[in-house]
Amino acid sequence: MVAVADWFLTGSDAMPAGQAKDPSEAFSNADAPLGSLVMLASPNGSYDTPFGTKVKTTRPSIANLKTAYVAWLERLKLNPQSRGVFYFCGHGISDGETQYLVADDFGEDEADIWNAVFQLTMTVQATLRKSKASLFYFIDACMELSEEIINQLEDPKALIGGSRRGALTTTDWAIVRATTANRLAYAPDGGVAHFTQALLSALRGHCGVEHPSGNGYSVDVARLRAAISEFLEFLQPEGMADRQKIGKTEGDGNWTVPLHVLSKRPSVMLELDVLPQGFRPIAQAFMEDTALVRDTKPLATGPVRFVREHGEWTYGTNSTDPTSFPEKIYNRKLLTNAAVRRLIKVD
């Protein structure tokens, strides 16, 4: 939660002049600058902003979530060109198809513990008829099957009411979920959840397409989803049996509305290793540009990573002992992904 807030607030819209981070590190969008940021966090406490103030946070109880959501919608209505971002990191469950998100006060009302759970898709469907803004939902929560919710007499409701009738006023929206149906979403002990870390890695300069104006590179849902998926794979331990994969993305439109705009070409993170791994002590990996300038790193301690702008690159592996194995080289490969892993087999 804090990491996402920091990404938004360390950009030029919130930081004092001269102290903002580059768009490869923080939010930037001249067409839709940051207008507001509201954080509900558990436990109750405060948030130390990047610009030096301390802000009290609100508990994400179901009542507070509803109040904050309605206020968010009212702000979005002020400008049809707005981009609305809803980020949720917490508990989630599923009835096998539909995802339900759990508020912080779940279980406190013993007469109806499920009134602190809300239905995500219906919340979004109601929202689409109340604003013209483009909407981005990033949901870092489990979709584990819950027989308890299946057996309830009444399904949990949306955060807001709405009618099925009438045309949608929002034509470009998406829900990007951390995991697939009936599965968990993981986080390291004391660390940032895998999906959130992958989302932030993607936003920090690793995906985008040239902006229609010719100035900068647009980061939209279409590019973000692919980049998040690639980083999510990188963040999970080797050999993990139940690997978390990005879930089904719901939405309408062509998913090309820029959430974020980079000032320079996106970069690829290329990870290289050698097989068999017994060669690691004498092996090294390299990456070379079109001017034949080569950057070499030893593989003695394991895989190495290079971060370079999207484009044509030559890469490969060789040995500090020329009698062990010949250089293996891949010439002028076009690299436009966010994160790429290559295991290079040598003889």
Curated annotation (Swiss-Prot):
TM regions (residue ranges): none
InterPro entries with a match to the protein in the record: Caspase-like_dom_sf, Pept_C14_caspase
Protein name: Uncharacterized protein y4kE
One Pfam family in the UniProt entry: Peptidase_C14
Source organism, top-level taxon: Bacteria
Keywords in alphabetical order: Plasmid
Gene Ontology BP term (one): proteolysis
GO molecular function, one term: cysteine-type endopeptidase activity
Signal peptide: none
